[in-house]
């Protein structure tokens, strides 16, 4: 009883009495959320595992799909293109079905299953189709790329990059190259050797402070590649001409050359000694400027072919040659500030004599031409020029007074000079002569003008007097002649 009661107490809750009670089996209460259990017609397999699910079922599916794929590829030559498209589409659909049914299936399993039958086909095409059907992560893509690169083989005539031996400079020794490439290789090797041997010592000297900037530039240019500056090998320095430096045919002064312009125009391929070249260019430019006739002509003053009486009276001695051209004897005279005191005094006396004895009349006509004539009031022509006064001005006649021409002269001190007046021409002997009627008309004009003198010795500025003198006593024989005052 005790055992029975103990059993009952141990099996269930403690009860009173010795009756044995068995536990009842209660059915599991099903809820609407639970799906009904599908019963398969196949007999249940014992001990199912993930290997059977990953290998057996996909293998059967792959076998059926591979049979279709092989048949489509083998008989594609005899079939039309439309049939081939249908077969390929069916194969792709079959492969997609396989991937949907078995998402854990890998590419290696597919290749291992199809390996016996795919050996006769183009494996590259199969691989391409398989790759197009999949999407890869970045790591998987990098791994596939590495595998493909490892399997790359060069053209049969050229050895692969893995089998060829490389030297220290990264150049292959088994590949045959042309003469030009061999020359470039030799130059590169030579340049590297020179750079390794000589560049260290040169740069050490510059770092210590012993080298100048010019030495640094020279070492830098020497260390450059020989093919970096092709013009440096066959460079023949030539001194830049004035036309290239300044852009003009001839420089006007040697000071126009500056070091900055020379450096800018000459370029980087010129000589290193710039200062010597600047000196040479300046000396050459000065030489050319002195030798050039245009520069010499520009230094000499240009004189008018007509000499005025006022210039002659101031002391500028001028004379006429046989051709009628004026030769100035004081072209290289000192400036006005350097004239001696005695010469200045003589010039003052001559100007005073002009005020007393002669008047220079200048009139302008409506057409823009000027007429100049010399007043000779109070002065009579003499037959001998040696009897002329020392401080006066006289107009003499060397020729016959009864002739058609007269030759006027101007006497200043002991010097007698010819005067070129309006209407003057050359006589048969080559001297300057004035027609007699022109000279007489000038004398009459002087007499009328002298009667209208003012207190300061100059003619009156009334327009009526000038107009009457011009109308009455001015000759218009030479309409094209112009005299400059």
UniProtKB/Swiss-Prot annotation:
Compartments it resides in: Nucleus inner membrane
Swiss-Prot/TrEMBL keywords: Acetylation, Membrane, Nucleus
Superkingdom per UniProt: Eukaryota
Residue stretches of biased makeup (Polar residues): 373-393, 452-469
GO process terms (BP): nuclear membrane organization
Residue ranges, annotated region (Disordered): 1-50, 74-116, 249-270, 364-404, 444-485
Keyword presence, Iron: no
Nuclear localization signal (motif): residue ranges: 22-25
GO cellular component: endosome; Golgi apparatus; nuclear envelope; nuclear inner membrane; plasma membrane; trans-Golgi network
Composition bias, Basic and acidic residues: 32-42
Modified residues (N-acetylmethionine): 1
Transmembrane segments: none
Keyword Isomerase set for record: no
Disruption phenotype: Aberrant nuclear morphology.
Acidic residues: bias regions: 82-98
Function comment: Required for nucleus structure organization (e.g. size and shape).
Subunit structure: Core component of the LINC complex which is composed of inner nuclear membrane SUN domain-containing proteins coupled to outer nuclear membrane WIP proteins, the nucleoskeletal CRWN/LINC proteins, and, possibly, KAKU4. Interacts with CRWN1 and CRWN4.
Listed name of the protein: Protein KAKU4
Species of origin: Arabidopsis thaliana (Mouse-ear cress)
Gene: KAKU4
């Amino acid at each position: 009883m005790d055992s029975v009661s103990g059993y009952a107490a141990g099996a269930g809750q403690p009860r009173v009495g010795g009756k044995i009670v068995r536990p009842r089996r209660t059915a599991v209460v099903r809820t609407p959320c639970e799906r009904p259990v599908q019963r398969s017609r196949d007999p249940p397999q014992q001990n199912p595992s993930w290997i059977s699910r990953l290998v057996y079922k996909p293998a059967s599916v792959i076998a059926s799909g591979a049979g279709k794929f092989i048949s489509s590829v083998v008989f594609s030559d005899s079939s039309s293109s439309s049939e081939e498209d249908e077969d390929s589409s069916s194969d792709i659909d079959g492969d997609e079905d396989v991937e949907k049914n078995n998402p854990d299936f890998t590419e290696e399993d597919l290749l291992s299953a199809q390996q016996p039958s795919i050996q006769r086909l183009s494996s590259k095409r199969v691989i391409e189709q398989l790759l197009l059907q999949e999407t890869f992560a970045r790591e998987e893509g990098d791994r596939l790329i590495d595998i493909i690169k490892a399997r790359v083989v060069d053209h049969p005539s050229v050895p692969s990059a893995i089998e060829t031996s490389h030297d220290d400079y990264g150049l292959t020794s088994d590949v045959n190259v042309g003469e030009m490439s061999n020359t470039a290789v030799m130059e590169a090797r030579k340049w590297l050797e020179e750079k390794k041997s000589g560049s260290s010592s040169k740069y050490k000297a510059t770092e210590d402070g012993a080298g100048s900037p010019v030495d640094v530039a020279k070492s830098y240019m020497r260390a450059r590649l020989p093919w970096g500056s092709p013009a440096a090998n066959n460079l023949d320095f030539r001194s830049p001409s004035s036309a290239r430096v300044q852009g003009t045919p001839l420089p006007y002064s040697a000071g126009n050359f500056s070091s900055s312009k020379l450096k800018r125009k000459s370029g980087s391929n010129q000589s290193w000694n710039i200062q010597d070249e600047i000196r040479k260019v300046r000396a050459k430019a000065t030489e050319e400027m002195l030798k050039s006739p245009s520069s010499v002509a520009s230094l000499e003053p240009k004189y008018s072919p007509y000499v005025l009486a006022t210039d002659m009276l101031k002391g500028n001695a001028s004379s006429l040659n046989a051709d009628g051209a004026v030769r100035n004897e004081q072209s290289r005279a000192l400036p006005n500030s350097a004239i001696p005191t005695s010469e200045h005094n003589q010039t003052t006396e001559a100007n005073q004599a002009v005020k007393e004895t002669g008047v220079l009349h200048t009139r302008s006509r409506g057409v823009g031409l000027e007429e100049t004539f010399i007043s000779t009031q109070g002065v009579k022509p003499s037959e001998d020029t040696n009897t002329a006064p020392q401080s006066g001005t006289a107009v003499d006649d060397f020729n016959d007074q009864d002739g058609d021409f007269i030759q006027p002269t101007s006497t200043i001190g002991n010097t007698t000079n010819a005067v070129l007046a309006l209407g003057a021409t050359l006589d048969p002997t080559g001297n300057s002569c004035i027609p007699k009627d022109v000279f007489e008309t000038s004398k009459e004009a002087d007499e009328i003008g002298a009667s209208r003198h003012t207190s300061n010795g100059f003619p009156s500025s009334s327009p009526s007097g000038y107009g009457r003198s011009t109308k009455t006593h001015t000759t218009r024989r030479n309409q094209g002649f112009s005299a400059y005052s």
